[in-house]
């Protein structure tokens, strides 16, 4: 497969059980008291499945549903923060709440209106897609703290006339040409949160160096990729080349979004395609020097959804607060639904199960705690972060 380029609205209670670029390891940023010394965080984000489908029994994705939880922690009450895709991706790196345009997946690559202002908790007051430079992101924080990051986007640049091989996005004001996969290219800009912030894309060299193709497991990159640009497989070979924060987005086939896949590279089952991607890339990550030293891998889903015409799950948790532009983050409800998440780390006992409530803002807040960074947006107000309930192994 080398070529694979607090309380919830449902009322759940919290409990935990157990069974059985250049990376900087010494920096001015320090983790919050009581947290393990994690210095390399990896996120793989998948598409459109609720907890009962993904982690149900029997599951069509046994690697994700059974194998990976046995290696780390299963968070059974982890929630997305909105519908549809783009607002969840954006939230993970900025703490920004959904607004009507990114709830609709930003089919046009447009700015916020110039009249938009900053409201409580750093939220932008209007509706738009590309956030103004006044909105700080996790990548901006990491750079300021002399820590490193990269977004690895599968298929980006496979067809250079569709999107650039690095920092791929439409011209401002134009339609997004990546809304649907085409033969040979399943990159979707709406699943690449970094290109929705002027604080990243306005510095072309900065964005080009940090938002790159995933590449293959052998290190091959799409034709036209700038010389010297490396993908995940190459970066994982040494601690010094592994970013402190890695955000990994599969293409529209292997993230489980499309079924069947237009490129006919996957199964008719989105869950089988998800398992194929994870079986290919997770062992590469968990066997890397950086992960074994001080790593944390999160595998999660953008939102809960169904493919049979039923309304999407729009439940929420963790004191999720609507932003100023959208009263219902989940369009029909207060959130993005229950999706579940798996965490793997040397600092997590194998077989841990947590029923505590978490969401995407919990993820952002935890990463900021680990790296000693201020909280952004709704990471300030979320009621739960990953702590001793999760990090059950002293290492």
What are these regions (language model features)?
Residues 5-7:
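C-terminal motif of bacterial Sec signal peptides marking the signal peptidase cleavage site
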Residues 1, 15-17:
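Sec-dependent N-terminal signal peptides
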Residues 11-12, 20-395:
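N-terminal pro-sequences and low-complexity stem/linker regions of secreted or lumenal proteins
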